[in-house]
A protein has these predicted regions:
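Conserved H-loop
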Residues: 30
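Short beta-strand->loop micro-motif that forms the acidic, two-metal-ion catalytic signature
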Residues: 43-47
Length: 106
């Protein structure tokens, strides 16, 4: 990933952190794994422990970042859903948590 793109992605994470105050933001997918191409989107996992409706939070974050004009996929979880997913052995979530790049942590 280029330094310019790295700065852009970190800036997006900083905006999310400031506006939504999550516990953690993790970059996953092709940008985190070092395999982006011209069609890649930015994949972000956002953990907000007390989010009553994580799906709604994902939509709110997407709306907030609309002006960034960048293809993004936002996956938001609260602590309860994260714990259940990890307990069930959800490979997708475990992969994000163990191999993703932490951009923000409170």
């Amino acid at each position: 990933m280029s330094k310019e793109m790295e700065k852009k992605i970190q800036g997006i994470a900083d905006k999310i952190a400031k506006e939504f105050k999550p516990e953690k933001i993790i970059l996953f997918g092709s940008y985190a794994w070092g395999t982006p191409n011209e069609d890649s989107d930015v994949d972000l996992f956002v953990l907000k422990k007390d989010a009553p409706n994580p799906r709604e939070l994902s939509g709110d974050i997407r709306g907030y970042l609309w002006s960034a004009k960048m293809a993004m996929d936002i996956v938001a979880y609260n602590q309860e859903i994260l714990d259940k997913s990890l307990k069930k052995g959800n490979f997708f979530i475990r992969n994000i948590i163990t191999k993703g790049k932490v951009l923000y942590e409170r």
